[in-house]
């Protein structure tokens, strides 16, 4: 139900573009234009036909809004504001606006092209912007994972990642740039449409010229909106997509080597704001250092740009950024605090308006020492010593964390890694353990299945003699995770892509303490 509009959006584009082309080409071929120029005006005739097509489009949109809602309710999944808003946005973008684009495409072809040429242009546009376009666009670059992302962003109007397992935490992307795509193409087709009307209209030519200018403006605004940087979860074959960005980066940038720090971070105070990407103010309380120099080396994923580093007195400290390493200089070995301001995103583990998935092992906050984050795939890294965390998250959607939620909405507690989830996510308590899960996953996260599999794991845990603290199980999205990422054991909680596989992964050797 969640992905129905997105899987069919290419069909809506095909249907309305061909229907529009037939309607308007017949109008042009019947020579009706010459008859109406001297009477009601050519614009009113085309406007009337367009209104009929738009009315049909509205009806289709309403149906494909109500049907997924009804299906979701009948399936027993929780009906939340996030789910209703998502289905509404999906219907607007992938049904209505795709239908409008189809009408515009057909009108453009009817006004400017001959019969067969028009069909050819429509066919090529649909081919490039539909699901097959992802493979076609990669051919000139010698294969997948090499084409520039802007090319995919320009042409791939269909949802990306339909051939991959759905991310039930997130859904398919409905970020602002997806609407900017439609705006660009509506403007691109609207410009020649209104220029043509200005040529053939008997009157109101200035109105059509103004509409042409507005279309050009829409095209420019759409282009600007498309290229704005930020966190985008894109399971596509583009060079910088969620699938390929890290592999391409580390092909030309050596991953950091493992080198233990001569200090520890005693506590973190993280103030995070999530909009188009992650914006962070991190206050770190450091232990004494045994080093002779005044430098501290941290690991912070290279996708985050450090704006400033200051000490406890507010003095700016010099720092150097090289790949995943951050080297801070200018202070002695005494205990002190550092305040770092940085912003950015991880290409696969997203932080945007639609959702958050920030595992505690990807160094989205500074970790002490030099750590290797990539070795043929993402390598989970955790500090040797747990720290005290206080985490505040300003996000459009509710955020879930394994740390205890405080009255002011922050999270706090001692851990060796903080994981944050947001989106189509909920939590429940089973067997004394909090389970954070994607409620749209009707396979493993139906209430009865979730309870059964969690209790099975807890029994296996007791049988294995695992006495380590366990307060939370966090079910993570499956987004091309490496084997090491699929189940991660922290000091006080577990994250994994499936509860049913936790016992086999953690206790395969028959030992509980590992």
Question: Predicted segments — roles?
Answer:
Residues 391, 427-514:
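Juxtacatalytic substrate-recognition/specificity segment
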Residues 1-27, 197-209, 219, 434-449, ...:
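Hydrophobic alpha-helical transmembrane segments
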Residues 19-59:
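Helix-loop-helix units of permease transmembrane domains in multi-pass membrane transporters
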Residues 293-295, 303-357, 457:
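A surface-exposed beta-strand-loop module
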Residues 342-418:
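Extended, low-hydrophobicity, Ser/Thr/Pro/Gly-biased non-transmembrane segments
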Residues 81-82, 138-184, 204-276:
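N-terminal, polar/Ser/Thr-rich
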Residues 2-11, 15, 21-22, 50-118:
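Secretory targeting signals
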Residues 117-130, 207-218:
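Central hydrophobic cores of alpha-helical transmembrane segments
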């Amino acid at each position: 139900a969640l992905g129905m509009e997105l899987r069919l959006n290419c069909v809506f584009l095909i249907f309305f573009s061909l229907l529009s082309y037939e309607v308007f080409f017949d109008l042009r071929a019947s020579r009706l234009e010459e008859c109406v120029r001297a009477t009601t005006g050519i614009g009113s005739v085309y406007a009337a036909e367009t209104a009929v097509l738009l009315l049909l489009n509205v009806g289709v949109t309403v149906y494909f809004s109500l049907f997924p809602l009804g299906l979701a309710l009948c399936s027993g999944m929780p009906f939340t504001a996030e789910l209703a808003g998502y289905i509404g946005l999906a219907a607007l973008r992938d049904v209505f606006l795709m239908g409008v684009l189809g009408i515009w495409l057909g009108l453009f072809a009817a006004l400017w092209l001959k019969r067969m040429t028009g069909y050819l242009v429509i066919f090529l546009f649909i081919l490039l912007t539909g699901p097959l376009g992802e493979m076609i666009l990669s051919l000139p670059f010698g294969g997948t994972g090499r084409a520039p992302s802007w090319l995919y962003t320009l042409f791939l109007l269909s949802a990306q990642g339909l051939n991959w397992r759905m991310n039930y935490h997130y859904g398919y992307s409905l970020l602002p740039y997806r609407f900017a795509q439609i705006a660009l193409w509506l403007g691109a087709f609207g410009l020649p449409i209104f220029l043509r009307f200005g040529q053939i209209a008997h009157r109101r030519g200035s109105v059509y010229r103004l509409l042409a200018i507005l279309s050009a403006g829409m095209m420019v605004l759409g282009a600007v909106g498309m290229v704005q940087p930020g966190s985008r979860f894109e399971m596509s074959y583009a060079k910088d997509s969620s699938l390929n960005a890290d592999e391409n980066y580390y092909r030309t940038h050596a991953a950091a080597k493992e080198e233990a720090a001569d200090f520890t971070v005693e506590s973190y105070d993280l103030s995070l704001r999530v909009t188009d990407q992650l914006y962070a103010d991190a206050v770190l309380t450091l232990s004494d250092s045994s080093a002779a120099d005044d430098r501290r080396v941290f690991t912070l994923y290279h996708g985050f740009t450090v704006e400033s580093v200051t000490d406890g007195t507010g003095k700016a400290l010099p720092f150097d950024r090289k790949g995943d390493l951050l080297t801070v200089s200018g202070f002695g070995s005494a205990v002190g605090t550092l305040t770092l301001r940085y912003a950015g995103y991880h290409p696969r583990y997203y932080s945007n308006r639609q959702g958050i998935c920030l595992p505690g092992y990807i160094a989205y906050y500074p970790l002490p020492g030099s750590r290797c984050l990539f070795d043929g795939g993402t390598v989970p890294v955790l500090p040797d010593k747990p720290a005290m965390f206080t985490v505040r998250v300003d996000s459009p959607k509710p955020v879930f964390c394994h740390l205890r939620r405080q009255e002011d909405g922050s999270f706090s507690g001692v851990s060796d890694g903080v994981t944050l989830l947001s989106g189509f996510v909920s939590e429940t308590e089973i067997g004394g353990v909090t389970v954070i899960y994607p409620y749209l996953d009707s396979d493993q996260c139906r209430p009865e299945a979730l309870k059964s599999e969690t209790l099975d794991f807890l029994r296996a845990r007791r049988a294995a003699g695992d006495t380590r603290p366990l307060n939370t199980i966090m079910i993570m999205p499956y987004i091309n995770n490496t084997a090491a990422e699929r189940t991660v054991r922290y000091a006080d909680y577990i994250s994994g892509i499936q509860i049913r596989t936790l016992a086999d992964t953690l206790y395969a050797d028959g030992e509980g303490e590992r």
